Regions:
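N-terminal disorder-to-order initiation segments that are Gly/Lys/Arg-biased
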Residues: 1-77, 158, 164-171
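Acidic/glycine-rich C-terminal interaction modules and beta/coil loop segments
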Residues: 135-141, 146, 156-171
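Short, acidic/charged, Gly/Pro-enriched secondary-structure junctions
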Residues: 8, 76-148, 152
Length: 171
């Protein structure tokens, strides 16, 4: 598939009864395509213009997932160990970057031209405070990365004859 030169990180949500909520498992994928647009709509009930961004992300079957295997969302939810698995479903988070462990976030070094957090010179106090803790959460990811979307829909195009891939729409 042409123009698949982006690195993304997919964060799969999984209910953890011991934690009392979702745990977010990351998968870094090299060789994806990210296309984003900004749009506005007029909504009188919300006081006028409402801005939203929309992203279309394509992940070719041959993209590098770091050795992890794709599985359907039901199998992912029922698996005892998801360390070698990844999936795509509504509500997951996708970031246009190779997201480091949260403990390394403040000191991570980003190569020239690589997608990096909102503040490339170093984290300001607000961003640094927003990403403290042991685990990434959607709020922390959205505070740290400009290109961060919530998955709204997934189309499985793996049976396409010319370019088998998954297509994600998100906002």
């Amino acid at each position: 598939m042409k123009l698949c030169n982006d690195v993304i990180t997919v964060f799969n949500a999984r209910v953890d009864p011991d934690e009392g909520g979702n745990v977010w498992a990351p998968t870094v994928i090299a060789g994806a395509s990210w296309y984003a647009t900004d749009a506005s709509t007029v909504d009188a009930s919300k006081g006028g213009l409402v801005a939203a961004n929309k992203a279309t992300i394509r992940i070719p079957v041959e993209a590098d997932t770091g050795g992890k295997q794709y599985t359907d969302p039901v199998s992912y939810a029922n698996a005892e160990d998801v360390s070698g698995l990844w999936t795509l479903k509504g509500g997951d988070i996708v970031v246009r970057a190779a997201v480091p462990e949260i403990s390394d976030f403040g000191t991570a070094v980003f190569a020239e031209g690589e997608n990096h957090p909102v503040n490339s010179e170093g984290l300001d106090g607000v961003t640094r405070a927003a990403v403290t803790g042991a685990e990434w959460t959607p709020a922390k990811l959205k505070a740290a990365y400009a290109d961060c979307v919530t998955v709204l829909g997934v189309t499985d195009n793996r049976r396409a004859p010319n370019a088998p891939h998954w297509r994600i729409t998100g906002t």
